[in-house]
Amino acid sequence: MEEPVLRRTWAEIDLDALAHNYQQARRRIGPHVKYLGVVKADAYGHGAIQIARKLEQLGADYLAVSSLDEAKELRHGGIQAPILILGHTPPAMVPQLIEYRITQAVSALAKAEAYSAAAVESGGTLKVHIKVDTGMSRLGFLVREGHFDTGVESIAAACALPGLEAEGIFTHFAVSDEDDGDSEAYTRAQFDVFTRVLDALAARGRTFAIRHCANSGALARYPEMYLDMVRPGIALYGVGADAQRLDLRPVMSLKSSVSTIKTFDPGTDVSYGRTFRTQGRTRIGVLPIGYADGFFRGLSNRMSVVTAQGPAPQRGRICMDMSMIDLTGLPDVKVGDEVEIFGCRQRVDDLAAILNTIPYELTCAVSKRVPRVYIEGGKIVGRSLRLL
């Protein structure tokens, strides 16, 4: 493979791994269930346009983003697949939603009425998916205990508004990725509420072409919840709690290279705050990656990077642009050698566990100044560097 971006710091995006993860889900859901790939937040840091292009090539039926700007970016990048905006869009932007052929999630009757008025005024029709709050307590028509009948009536009223085409209806699970009994019961209760909503709407003559609720956790655990479409996010990128269960491969590998090596005497303090002191003669390597690149400062002195010769403990505080590693036991590592922060040899999940967070916080945090290098068939097929 040719040298990626002058071998400073980069994120390798393995499109073959992406294809593998997509096919794993396809085999699981069968030929009659649609596949929506979630590419919001720049495809969880992987590069939305490039990931969306690959998903479109693979046959994804739908894509999902968080905002109109994200949706427009995909359209400007040549993406033709249907796109669902999961988050809020101001009603004033409805003409753009229609122009760009974007489907909008609708989470309340008042919003539906505002979207309807804007669509009618523009002379077009806005395709929408109804969002139902069955237990996430975030966006969505409220249909839980004490609100079921009024919630269903509000959904029916929203679907009947002029200028709107209610193509789909969906909900979002709060703990479908957890294996304990309480979480399973909660997920099943959410699904039960959702199916009751569907039945109540069907009794009123309102049905939908696309019913969806299965996120990555439900994809791995609850095949009865696949309905018309699944909606994997983190599973698409091969990380998270279900990567092993679904036989997924990590798509992103964050890499850097050794820029400098120095040997220090015992008692030498390393980096800000003097949080590491050498105990013997110590060979320290400097990496051109820091917390401004997405290498979390909270990992300081708590993990190792991976070299071709083995793991190298990180030493001292991680700086904004640089970090230090201990090469004392790795005499063959030299300036210019590649190191892996996370990826195939060190899972991002393990670093997330150190930080008591989720792995996609780490992939999303890989900053825009880190070039994405796209690999397919062992060759570089694209690069992306976004500083603006």
Where are the regions that the model predicts?
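Conserved, mostly hydrophobic/aromatic
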Residues: L18, K40, L74, A108, ...
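C-terminal accessory subdomain/extension
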Residues: T263-L388
